[in-house]
Amino acid sequence: MSVENLKNSLPEYAKDLKLNLSSIARTTVLNEQQLWGTLLATAAATKSASTLKEIASEAADNLSAEAYNAALGAASIMGMNNVFYRTKGYLDGKYDDLRAGLRMNIIGNPGVDKADFELWSLAVSAINGCNHCLEAHENTLRQEGVDREVIFEAIRAGSIVAGVAQAVEANEILSAAQV
């Protein structure tokens, strides 16, 4: 199981995604932990079982156990936070005086470099469409001194994974239906 298997499973109509996935996996401004953590966290965020299995297999070879768990933790906590803060934002400040009451300890103590965890959280927030979390994580990354190019590359990687997951899921559904 690997990114190569994932690329090979993509149908012809997803050729651009195949090329983009090849490109992001080998030519990037992200270091290895940033890249594989981003790929793993965003694969988990897509909820595509096949995409997650293939990326997770290779991510396990490229990340420490702590980074692997932190990337999955970023996807999980953002799954909650993105829904909460996106919804709170839609309600025009009517609930801003109320305490969230949500545990988010992993954000303060992720077990990896804070900037890497923030980067993964940003990429997942892009997939989940939460502008409030995107802005908050981007601001934290900039305060940590992370270059714009690194931030942009993580967003690009997450976008590629989201597109790949969509193509994989569509192809699997249509294949099962024999359409």
UniProtKB/Swiss-Prot annotation:
InterPro entries associated with the record: AhpD (IPR004674), AhpD-like (IPR029032), AhpD_core (IPR004675), CMD-like (IPR003779)
Substrates-to-products reaction catalysed: N(6)-[(R)-dihydrolipoyl]-L-lysyl-[lipoyl-carrier protein] + a hydroperoxide = N(6)-[(R)-lipoyl]-L-lysyl-[lipoyl-carrier protein] + an alcohol + H2O
Keywords: Antioxidant, Disulfide bond, Oxidoreductase, Peroxidase, Redox-active center
Record GO terms (molecular function): alkyl hydroperoxide reductase activity; disulfide oxidoreductase activity; hydroperoxide reductase activity; peroxiredoxin activity
Matching Pfam families: CMD
UniProt EC number: 1.11.1.28
Tagged with keyword Oxidoreductase: yes
Positions annotated as active site in the UniProt record: C130, C133
EC class name: oxidoreductase
GO terms (BP aspect): cell redox homeostasis; response to oxidative stress
Keyword check for Ribosomal protein: no
Disulphides: C130-C133
Similarity field: Belongs to the AhpD family.
Function: Antioxidant protein with alkyl hydroperoxidase activity. Required for the reduction of the AhpC active site cysteine residues and for the regeneration of the AhpC enzyme activity.
Assembly and interaction partners: Homotrimer.
Name this polypeptide is given: Alkyl hydroperoxide reductase AhpD
